[in-house]
Amino acid sequence: MLLLFFLNFLYFSHAVFIDKYRDYKDYKYYELTGSREGLENLKKFMLNVDESLIHSESLNKSEIILSPHLVSLFREAVKKENLKVKILHDDISEIIRLEKGNTRRRIKKFSWNSYYDVNDIHQFILNTTKVNPEWTELIVAGQSYEGRKILGLRINTPYENGQRETGKPVFFIESGIHAREWIAPATTTYFINQLLTSRDPDIRRLRDQFDWRIFPTVNPDGYHYSYNVDRYWRKTRSLSSNGCRGADPNRNWDYNWGQHSASSRPCDYQLYAGSKPFSEIETRTLSKYISSIDNLLFYVAFHSYASLLLLPYSDSVEHVDNYDDLVQIGQRSIEYGSRVNGEKYDGPGTAAETLYKASGGSMDWVRYALKTPLVYTYELRGSSFHWPPEKIPEQGDEVVQMMLGLADGAKELGYY
């Protein structure tokens, strides 16, 4: 019995206690510019050399984090493809070390000058429901592969008799689907706090107009792993038949699955789309919860980083039937956000036109399968995945205003 307990303990604690912390000592961080074809050729070549290659891309720029032993090979490939290369960080471990110095557990009070592990984010959600029982309701959309709850928060104006107000349009926010994009859950919890504590009449109006369903970390296993073991981990933590871990949960939804910017190789560090649509329990259970919502008007996903506002569809340049409305409402959102710090997002436009083609994402599935009228993805600001923790409120205030812009724009066009 004791042996069985020990084996179970090892299995369920694998991510934290067996995997060695990856410090990325002497890893180089490069920015590449050039032709789209050249950038794509370089990426394919380097991925054939190293499936764990860390890369981020847009239409005419790529960024790569590279092991020191691959630098010579990389420079030869860059020369062959006639690309321009710029080194952003000579040793990325220093950035991670400084960031980790600002991550700490605060038991008494959750704040927005540090990044928190998923357990602390969940505790924030639980505490919020306890402090605001008349306004909030805990949502458990399901469980992750490793058994963590997929926790969300419902915020809705109560009637005077204490009953929830029904019939309002639903505003759904999804965040943290990609584990390494820490600023997304941080700004989402900041937004929750502002909805419930701000005395600004515009923010109170925003709160009262909708039935809110907000999920700060829809990939809790991946986020926990990124926080504790591998900073650049992006996927879930499911186990494939060949022993490799995880699938990209934003390539795993059942809309044109596996067609663009998706890998069929389970050991692909970033883009493995899973063995089939909704193979991941996180996407499967979340999709069931979303499907159960009546009167869903807005679906918003937060990612990082690019300062972009994206529209469906991600794998096609064809426009949805209310594309012009989406653009007009999105422009209002960008305008409102720019008032905070003078920073302006690019877009709005389809992901296929403004970023790159990608299939199997949540935004596209929600639009196609559920016919949700107003669907957006925000690629938050920054020049890397390392947004300074002391500047979380800066992004948070922009997000608050951008959500207000969406609401005002939609109301002006008669969506509610």
List each model region and its residues:
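M14 metallocarboxypeptidase catalytic domain recognition
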Residues: 2, 11-416
